Amino acid sequence: MKFKIGEDYDKFYSKVFNDKIKIKNSIRYGYTSFQEKNGNGHPNIMATRFDYLRIAKAIMDDYQNDTCVGKYLKEIHKRRIPKLSKEKEEPLFGRSKSYGGQFHMDFPGLKENVVFGMSGYGGNVILIDMENSRILVLNSLHYNNNKYKYNHKKLILDPFKKGK
């Protein structure tokens, strides 16, 4: 994005996160070691759990209200690409069958719904059901060995599918 936005990159992010989404805390976005002239942006951001929920709600609202961003989200869903991942890939919620933009899509058992998913460090998950106005957030500290792994079906897929 910095390539397209240019020098106003920080101003653009401030407008999106502060004015539109109305985050309550600072958002940190990543940088790479690439030279500045090539753009050193990184797709990851760090936010509080409540601000992640605000971001998910803004994404869902844009999709449903057919804004410019909403049209873009519909387009990336329409043009999603199959993943070339293995069946045994960990974590299990990451076994979605496709992706578009920065989102996981076509989750097992949820294929009939338009669901955008994001996953993060330590097993954190956000699922957004765009058409049924549902958001599921699972906050996790660790996901690096059997001691810390959780039941994906019980905590993510079943509640999201059944609404409980």
Segments the model singles out, each with a brief description of its role:
Residues 3-42, 47, 64-67:
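Active-site helix/loop module of the DD-peptidase/beta-lactamase fold
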Residues 16, 20, 59-62, 79-83, ...:
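Alpha-helix boundary/capping residues
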Residues 115-164:
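Structured C-terminal helix/loop/strand segments within mature extracytoplasmic catalytic/sensor domains
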Residues 9-19, 69-74, 150-158:
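Short alpha-helical "patches" and their helix-cap loops
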